[in-house]
Each structure stands twice: as C-alpha cells, then as structure tokens.
A protein has these predicted regions:
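Glycine-rich phosphate/adenosyl-contacting loop at the front of the ribokinase-like
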Residues: 1-71, 233-234
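Active-site beta-loop-alpha junctions enriched in small/polar residues
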Residues: 102, 125, 152-154, 178, ...
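Active-site metal-binding loops of divalent metal-dependent hydrolases
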Residues: 16, 125, 151, 243
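Conserved phosphate-binding/catalytic region of the ribokinase-like
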Residues: 1-9, 190-252
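Conserved phosphate/ATP/ADP-binding segment of small-molecule kinases
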Residues: 145-146, 156-223
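Structural motif
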Residues: 9-10, 118-119, 172, 204
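Glycosyltransferases and closely related glycan-assembly transferases
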Residues: 130-145
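Conserved N-terminal subdomain of the carbohydrate kinase-like
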Residues: 18, 45-124, 143
Length: 252
C-alpha cells in the first residue's frame, strides 16, 4: 500500500509476528497472517495488508509468503520498528501472551492507494495503535461488501468500546465464549447471543469453545454446532481458531 493502488477481492488486515514458545520454538503467525496463509492453501488469492521490520524476521516473512505463492504487494516494510514478536507462556495448559510493543504492524500505513475489498477480514489486536487503526477505518470506509471481525482480547491491548465500535458495521464476528461474555457485559447466556447479534446488527456470530467445538448463530435464529473429534494428544492450540475462520470465510 505504499505508492500504488492495490486491488483485492479478499483482503486480510492486521498483524504478522513470530510466536516464541518456552521450549525455544519460533513460529510465524498472528491471526490475520494465519488466516491469509490458510486461504492461500485453499487456492484463494488473499491480499494480506500488514507491516514487518527491515530485519531478518521481516525477510523471513516475505520468504515464507513467496514459498506459499502469496501476494506480498500489501506487505509493508518499516525502517525503524521491528517485526512483531509474542512470547507465549502456558498456565494450566492455557496459553498466555506477552505481545511486544511497539512493532511494525502497529504502523500499517494507508498510503495513496486504499484497496477496494469484496470481503475484508480483520482482527481487533491491530486496533491498539492509531496508525494501523486509522488505516483500518479507511479500508472499512472504502465499501467492502462483507466485513468479518475476528475478536482477540489480549490484555492490556484492548478497549471494550473500541472493539464494539468495530463489531458494529461488520456482518460476521468470530470470538470465543469468554470474549463474548466480556463484550456482552456478562449477558451471553440464554437469549444473550441473540441480543448481541441484534444490538450490533450482525448477520452471524461464530463462537468457539475450545474442546467443546464451535457454534454458528445467525440473525435468522439458526444455530449450527460443530463438535471436534476426540483428540489423542494436544501439543498446543495456538492458532487453531484461525483455520476455522478461514473455512468460515470460504463459505460466505
């Protein structure tokens, strides 16, 4: 998005980063990057709009994308800020995240060419800094026919009013059951899901529940539940929901 107009029917906006695990592993990720990666593997041609540093990690991101035949024209390079990193820790088997700030993806620039997207996917984490937040608002203001918001509430990098402002105006939202309870103000039980959909004028809501699978709720009152097959061994679940988001997007 630097210096030229970009076009993309399927746009993915947000962070690309490296997850750093306690055992020393470093895994390329970030929910938007993972979603774009999966969509590319399905044969789609998503335009990933993100930003990396002018460093070895940034070069590794570009190399990985080229190896997947992904479009790199929306991947910006920041001359000062580093490529994103997240230190992942586990407590009672549940992951926690220490997200390094600032990072290159906090400074995703709009430039003169804001793409017209048919479907725009974005998360909530990239809302934390003003530059990326303003670029996202320009993308949303450019008239995508469908906006899919993937909520990721990562303390301390979220604000309830700010996240809800982006939920409103979207057609589809994905979040886990804890995040739904946070955004619904504790009113997620019973008819609370229907009220959340109605109050935010959504077409549908995808709610994940870990080992209990996921449920799709629609504005028409439909409910579709998917339960996972029994797992013999789980290494970690970081990024698992991003594959689900990708499959959901393919069906919209």
């Amino acid at each position: 998005m630097q210096g030229q107009a970009l076009k993309g029917d399927l746009c993915v906006f947000g962070e690309v980063l490296f997850d750093e695990f306690p055992d020393g592993r470093r895994v390329l990720g970030g929910a938007p990057f993972n979603v774009a990666w999966h969509l590319a593997a399905f044969g789609e041609g998503p335009l990933l709009i993100s930003r990396v540093g002018d460093d070895a990690d940034g070069a590794a991101v570009r190399d990985a994308m080229r190896g997947q035949d992904m479009n790199t024209s929306g991947l910006q390079t920041d001359p000062d800020l580093p490529t994103g990193r997240v230190r992942v820790r586990f407590e009672d088997g549940e992951p926690g995240y220490d997200i390094v700030h600032p990072a290159a993806w906090d400074a995703i620039a709009a430039g003169p060419g804001v793409p017209a997207c048919g479907l725009l996917y974005h998360g909530s984490l990239a809302l934390r800094d003003e530059t990326s937040r303003n670029t996202l608002q320009r993308l949303r203001g450019n008239g995508p026919s469908l906006v899919f918001v993937d909520v990721n509430l990562r303390p301390p990098w979220w604000n309830r009013e700010q996240v809800l402002a982006n939920v409103q105006g979207a057609q589809w939202v994905k979040l886990n059951h804890h995040e739904l309870d946070e955004l619904a103000g504790g009113d997620a039980a019973g008819d609370g899901v229907a009220r959340f959909i109605e109050s935010n004028d959504l077409e549908g809501l995808l709610v994940t529940a870990g080992e209990n699978g996921a449920t799709v709720y629609t504005a028409r009152g439909e409910e579709f539940r998917a339960r996972p097959m029994p797992a013999t061994e789980v290494v970690d679940t970081v990024g698992a929901g991003d594959a689900l988001s990708s499959v959901m997007i393919l069906g919209l």
